[in-house]
Amino acid sequence: FRDRAPRVERIPCAHMGYVGGVFSFSTGEEGEPCDWWRFEDLLIPRTRVESAVGFDRSAVTVTPTTYEDMRPGCYDKPSRLADMDAGRIEAMMCYPSSFPRFCGQTFSETPDKELGLACIEAYNNWMVEEWCADTGGRLIPLMIVPLWDPELAAAEVRRNAARGVRAVTFSEIPAYLGLPSIHTGYWDPFFAACEAADVSVHMHIGSSSKMPSTSADAPPLVASALTFGNAMSSM
C-alpha cells in the first residue's frame, strides 16, 4: 500500500471557509500556499485554526497554512516537549488531527477496508513506537480502531493494550457517522475488549463529523458556542 499511503502535498488554496457549521475549501492556482493531506480521493487542508499556538488571537482564523508556518511543537516531538515545559504541562493525551479525524473516521470510511485497516495499524504503530516513545509517559498514546467492524475494533484494542496502550478514541455519536448507536449491542465486542484490558474510551467534541449550528449562514462563532452540545448528545 506504500503508493496509496497518505502523503502531504503543497497546493494553492483558492477558498477556505466555515459557515453554518460546515467547513468548505477548494484548490486554485492563484490561491494561498497550503499543505494538504492526500489520501485516495480525499484532499484535506492544514488550517491556521488547528495549529493556532504562537499566533495572536486575532490571527487565529480559518485560513490555509503550511508546516513551515506552524510552531514546530505541532509536529516535532522534542519541540512539543519543550513547549509543554514552557506551559507547565506535565502530560497530554494525543488525539488525532483533522486528517485522520477525531476517531479515525478517514481510514474507517475508505471503501478499501484492507487499506483502511493497514492505515489504522500504521497510525497506531507510529503513535506508540515513535510519537509517544521515550517521553516518560508525558505524551499519552490514544489508539484509533476500525469502526466498520466491532470484532476488528476489539482485536486492535487488544493488540495495542498488549504493549501498554490504555486509551482509545471513539465517536461521540456514532449514528451520525452512519453506524449503529451504542444502544444496539453492535459495539459490545469493542466495549468488552476495552473493559477486559482496562482501556478507557475517549470522545472528542466533533468526533461525530457533524457540528451544530442554527442556520446555513451562521458565522463560525455560533457553531463554536454550540459545539459542546454534541457532548450532551453522546448518550
Functional labels for PLM-detected ranges:
Residues F1-M235:
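Helix-coil boundary/capping segments in enzymes
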